Amino acid sequence: MAFCNFIKGYEPPCSAIYKNPYREWIGAQIRTDYYGYINPGNPEAAADMAWRDASISHIKNGIYGAMFVAAALSTAAITDNIEDIILSGLAHVPHTSRFYEDVMQVVNGYKNGISCKECFENIHEKYDEYTGYGWCHTNPNAIITVASLLYGEGNYGKSICMAVETGFDTDCNGATVGSIFGMAHGIESIPEYWQRPIKDKLQTSIFGVGTVSISERVAKTLTQMRK
């Protein structure tokens, strides 16, 4: 929608607002991992880059999710403590936002001993994945990501499967959980049986790019990080 608005002459932030029903959807949150990768240990810089990117197409919670993920990934480069990673991500979004409130509700529930089953039931009670707006909104998907990391107990497979099995935007949540988990724990924490089928290939779905080598993308990311 933002691209269409560009063609019509709208620039940010109007490009994110004009006739855009997707402005608080998950689209920005799922494209800002890179800013965390290239800013290890600098969540403020990662969140700033994510904000600049997300503001083109999203507003409010749509932006906050992007900033949260970027900042969390940046912090995951220097610690494997999931709670610290989540709280660092939250430190870079407005504390008066619904996004902050939703994530903190999950974090506090986890700390207070709420079971995994009850946590995910609460998410489904609060948000309806069967509505056109609800299934892809940033907030429910962000808290599914957070809950999966917390209740996954440091197990890669358990964490990503939990994110996918819970519903809503399943592929995006599994990917974000895997991204944060991998940054925090390193590739050695990901069992070989999860890596083998990938065969070092990434299908980008980008016209003119197609399939690329993951290891080559990693090398380019490291080069950018060192600049």
Language model region names:
Residues 2-23, 32-43, 51-56, 70-167:
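Accessory "access/gating" subregions that flank catalytic or transport cores
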Residues 44-48, 84, 192-196:
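Short sequence/structural elements of tandem HEAT/ARM alpha-solenoid repeats
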Residues 58-74, 78, 144-220:
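Catalytic phosphate/nucleotide-handling subdomain of diverse soluble enzymes
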Residues 96-122, 126-135, 184-227:
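Acidic, carboxylate-rich catalytic segments that either coordinate divalent cations
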